[in-house]
Amino acid sequence: MTQANNAVYTDISAAQLVEEAIRRGEGELAANGSLVVRTGHRTGRSPVDRFIVEEPSTKDAIAWGNINRPFPADKFDALWARVEAFNNAQDHFVSHVHVGSAEAYYLPVKMTTATAWQNLFGRCLFIEPEQYNPAGKDEWQVLNVANFECVPERDGTNSDGCVILNFAQKKVLIAGMRYAGEMKKAMFSVQNFLLPERDVLPMHCAANIGEAGDVTLFFGLSGTGKTTLSADESRYLIGDDEHGWGEGVVFNVEGGCYAKCIDLSEKNEPVIWKAIKFGAVLENVVLDEERVPNYADDSLTQNSRAAYPLEHVEKRSEKNLGGEPNAVIFLTCDLTGVLPPVSILNNEQAAYHFLSGYTALVGSTEMGSGGGIKSTFSTCFGAPFFPRPAGVYAELLIKRIKAFGSKVYLVNTGWTGGGYGVGKRFNIPTTRGVIAAIQSGALIGAETEHLDIINLDVPKVVPGVETNLLNPRNTWADKAAYDEAAKGLAKQFIENFKKFEVSDAIKAAGPQL
């Protein structure tokens, strides 16, 4: 540890970071040993405050628009200098971590934060290597100064906070942001831009591995079940959110998990429950007077979170990676109650549904989405994090699926028996039954039934799952109402898909009217 007038705490232990956070009034200890913090008025990501510096390497390679907003290079340099000078005048924390577990694909990152707790968060979520940057790669810098306030008129930002990626300089600037998920997603976006150049598909998915070495991927937006379903006591966890798929390997981009905590229970999510202990960070979780977390309390936000390192998960892949996936699962939370609990997809359907990314925003991670639930289409099941045009990722996915022979499934973790407010949400044990059947190989070559309007094939039998749930039309009391809802959903799919320039075979793989 180096001390100066303004102390710089470099690569100190997790215990020391917890100590510093409490000493500075950044958070408090919960009864389970975790550090509990509040993130202020931002309790989720702030997409309107995220920018990418426009320069020669990015100018023609990025899908510019509302998600990827351009930022002038000169404005970035001025703001970086301003934030860095501000931070150098106060105590701060530095850690050296990797982003990407596979030797060939890691990025070395110098992470500087103004708060001890955000440094601990980064240490939970990124990878603490035994040896830092053994290959001597160019270093990335993350500068995360939560107590700096941007001035839009002066700095060119949208508000008092910003997240700006600069690929030319290998820098990520985060200012005025207390919600630590911004740091994790910023580095994910960096890898999502860089990995396709190496013929690696970056994915917003969870991954786990069975005793036999079989790997399953779970794609899905926040709240669809990635973290919950991949945390399976019978399998080894690779990771819960960000992975790369290259020839012969699926590897975690991270070294930890970022689990939603709302209504967390030991019964339904034992792996996550046990992982929340000393060294973990709880964001925006309410404690009772005994300091016991009340996970049902959403008075601060629906998007309460736990960050913990993979070492807190007993059954995990020691190397943070596995082989190529036998099963690829697209998780969708369907609010309409139209989609079946499981559909078996061919390659064209896989491309169609990957590009569509249909789901719901459930207890959304984005600011301004409120507690309301609404349907959305999020390309690649993670549009906010993929800087290149969607076709780049879709082509890589199909290339990988074809080369390895992965089987692809669409799994609905949303509503059945009617839409939101009428039907009910599939319970976790039912969805776990579907996943277990997929992983056992029981659905390979299974007899299927074709559902016309939504153009999906559903297995007639899924071991461990009630047969009457498999065809969603059967679960609706009013069959005509189901048909109308199915047509309505098909229209949404068709309308959304107009923006993609793809082959007729892929277009024909979606819902038809």
From Swiss-Prot:
HAMAP family: PEPCK_ATP. Pathway: Carbohydrate biosynthesis; gluconeogenesis. It catalyses: oxaloacetate + ATP = phosphoenolpyruvate + ADP + CO2. One of its GO terms (biological process) is gluconeogenesis. The keyword Magnesium does not apply. NCBIfam families: pckA, PRK09344.1-2, PRK09344.1-3, PRK09344.1-5. Mn(2+) binds at residues 185, 204, 241. Its cofactor is Mn(2+). Monomer. Its EC number is 4.1.1.49. GO terms for cellular component: cytosol. Binds 1 Mn(2+) ion per subunit. One of its GO terms (molecular function) is phosphoenolpyruvate carboxykinase (ATP) activity. It comes from Pseudomonas aeruginosa (strain UCBPP-PA14). Keywords: ATP-binding, Cytoplasm, Decarboxylase, Gluconeogenesis, Lyase, Manganese, Metal-binding, Nucleotide-binding. It comes from the Bacteria. This is Phosphoenolpyruvate carboxykinase (ATP). Its main location: cytoplasm. It is found in: Cytoplasm. ATP binds at residues 185, 204, 220-228, 269, 305, 431.
